[in-house]
């Protein structure tokens, strides 16, 4: 069941349905284990964040920056901001100081949330040049602050600002009640063809349409475990995360990109969005593994992938039934060699694997499907709240295609350059 509502109410309404079910999980690097956050706790942290933002003087449609790696706190702040009708402006965790300075001043940001030492140091280095910036809130308690820093606070200190203040809670509820689809949800800075980055405005109504339209095609359920690999600051991952949360799925938040393969084996996700480069590395790793094996092993794996590719490209992707001999051969490989391959990657329960952001080569796309990963290739823009088109699992799919338009989206190919108009 998908919960469709203004994003200011999504986590609250989801907690009413799912309660103590795990909504978010993350690796605790001190304990070396994955920790869970229930929907109830998620909703409490969102509400605490909303009240504390009021305490800091954040008003309706004020801009709040999040400069961090993927963390649960990023989502607490984002949805807490939505409850205030405030706007989240996410920065990539690797953003340089000059760009941070530009975006803070351009968006008139008063509060910035930083993830770890690198983001804190970068922000502090340009603090004197950011004339609107009043507060730095630090997610990681291990961050060492500058000796002269008297404006930053830890995330725990931030959360305590709104405790036992009924007036803050009343103000948050008033803003939730007044929330409109025309409210700005995000400003996403993207590199322009010339000059400084441009801030793309996304409205709550755009998200609401996108979330509803996707679930007409994709089947995401509360049983899904979705690992977050791409940064939330990217429209692809940010919109995908909101879609999965609206369907009650669990988000397994991967902090460090280099840990992704380890995280996949530990979490055993059913879904993950990625760029083609991720699958290219997986494919290259399989090829290298094949070359290090015996001739018999190489030939068996090659044949398994060949059979899997034929099964998908000629039959499954076209909605056709394969000949009995091919079906039996594929079933044998699927239960043995291909199953081992999926287990090695930590993807034994595959459901949906969206891929976008660049062109994926036919060779890699063929491999992904041959191995049994239901990849959904697509195309999108920041301005369109990510998706323009993607492969519809219930419709015929062609190798190299970027699928069919999202319901409600109109596309036109125009001019001598075959420009895509949306």
Ranges and model annotations:
Residues 10, 56, 83-161:
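Structural core segment of the AMP-binding/adenylate-forming
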Residues 19-22, 138, 153, 160-189, ...:
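Conserved pre-ATP/AMP-binding loop-to-beta segment of ANL
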Residues 24-79, 96-101, 154-159, 204-205:
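Conserved AMP-binding/adenylate-forming core of the ANL superfamily
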Residues 36-40, 177, 185-211:
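Conserved AMP-binding A3 loop
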Residues 43-48, 200-221, 229, 339:
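Conserved structural elements of the adenylate-forming
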Residues 95-128, 210-227, 257-271, 344:
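Conserved ATP-dependent adenylate/AMP-binding module captured primarily in the ANL superfamily
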Residues 208-225, 232-335, 349:
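Conserved AMP-binding/adenylation subdomain of ANL enzymes
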Residues 329, 333-422:
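Conserved AMP-binding/adenylate-forming
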């Amino acid at each position: 069941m998908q919960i469709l509502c203004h994003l200011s109410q999504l986590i609250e309404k989801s907690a009413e349905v799912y309660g103590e079910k795990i909504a978010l999980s993350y690796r605790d690097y001190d304990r070396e284990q994955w920790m869970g956050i229930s929907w109830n706790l998620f909703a409490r942290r969102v509400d605490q964040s909303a009240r504390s933002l009021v305490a800091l003087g954040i008003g309706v449609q004020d801009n709040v920056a999040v400069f961090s790696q993927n963390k649960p706190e990023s989502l607490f702040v984002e949805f807490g901001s939505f409850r205030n009708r405030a706007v989240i402006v996410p920065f990539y965790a690797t953003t340089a100081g000059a760009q941070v300075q530009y975006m803070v001043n351009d968006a008139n940001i008063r509060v910035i949330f930083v993830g770890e030492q690198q983001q804190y140091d970068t922000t502090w280095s340009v603090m004197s040049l950011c004339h609107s910036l009043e507060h730095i809130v630090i997610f990681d308690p291990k961050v060492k602050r500058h000796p002269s820093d008297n404006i930053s606070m830890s995330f725990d200190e931030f959360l305590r600002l709104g405790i036992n203040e009924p007036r803050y809670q009343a103000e948050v509820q008033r803003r939730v009640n007044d929330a409109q689809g025309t409210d700005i949800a995000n400003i996403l800075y993207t590199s322009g063809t010339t000059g400084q980055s441009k801030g793309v405005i996304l409205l709550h109504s755009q998200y609401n349409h996108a979330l509803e339209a996707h679930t007409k095609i994709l089947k995401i359920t509360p049983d899904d475990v979705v690992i977050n690999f791409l940064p939330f600051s990217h429209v692809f991952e940010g919109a995908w995360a909101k879609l999965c949360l609206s369907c009650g799925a669990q988000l397994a938040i991967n902090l460090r990109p280099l840990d992704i393969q380890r995280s996949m084996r530990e979490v055993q996700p059913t879904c993950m969005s990625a760029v083609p480069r991720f699958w290219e590395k997986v494919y290259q790793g399989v090829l290298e593994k094949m070359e290090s094996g015996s001739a018999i092993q190489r030939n068996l794996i090659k044949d398994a992938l060949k059979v899997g590719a034929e099964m998908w490209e000629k039959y499954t992707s076209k909605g056709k039934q394969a000949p009995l001999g091919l079906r039996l051969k594929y079933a044998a490989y699927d239960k043995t060699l291909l199953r081992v391959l999926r287990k090695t990657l930590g993807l034994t329960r595959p459901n949906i694997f969206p891929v976008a952001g660049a062109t994926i080569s036919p060779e890699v796309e063929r491999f992904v499907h041959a191995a049994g990963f239901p990849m959904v290739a697509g195309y999108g823009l920041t301005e369109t709240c990510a998706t323009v088109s993607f492969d519809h699992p219930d419709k015929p799919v062609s190798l190299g295609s970027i699928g069919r338009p999202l319901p409600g989206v109109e596309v036109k190919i125009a001019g001598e350059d075959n420009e895509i108009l949306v």
